[in-house]
């Protein structure tokens, strides 16, 4: 066998070895991708658009791992001309997270007819529910729904939004208008006692900032602490 023949044999062996490596590489890449796909959390999103209301728009995205994202836009308050875009992340309690996904399942993940279709009803905002997971991506637009599960979800998300909007206003007032905190916290405490708010712990950071701020009057600081310690009534039932 000549030197040239030996070189050809060695080249052929190297090519065969290279070909053997490709299936292993493909398997490795597949295994590295599959876990990330499998662990992507499911999500439920609620959004509401209501011109000339406060806020005019908001959306809440809740993931099956409990992570949640809220964003809104509109006036800081009904009697203010200041407009603000706001967004924040927070963690839901296990009970509320489980309730949201349980109600989404009862509503067939919003895949069927959700809106009542009654055109005589007053417009209360353009609402949308979206469900996403590895197998589904379904949504429904509605003004009013007769489905009990959708009604409960709507009330729960609106209670969540009310809590987050208190957080938005308190953040603004604490920085720019501290005298407005007294009335704002009074309203928040009253609504929490009535069960109109959900997940008060989501705004605990700003409540703590107010309580820790010695430049804020004591009655306001005391009310902020009381709200932090409250166990609100279940919302959305």
Per-segment meaning from a language model:
Residues 72-112:
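A short-motif feature that recognizes glycine-rich, charge-decorated loops
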Residues 65, 91-99, 131-137:
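A short, structured loop/turn motif at beta-sheet edges
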Residues 37-52, 113-237:
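Short, well-ordered, aromatic-rich surface patches in folded extracellular/luminal domains
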Residues 68-82, 158-169:
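A short, surface-exposed interaction/processing loop segment used at functional sites
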Residues 41-43, 55-57, 63-65, 95, ...:
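Extracytoplasmic
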Residues 48-72:
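N-terminal targeting signals for Sec/Tat export/insertion, comprising classic cleavable signal peptides
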Residues 3-24:
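Bacterial N-terminal signal peptides that target proteins for export
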Residues 23-33:
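Bacterial N-terminal signal peptides
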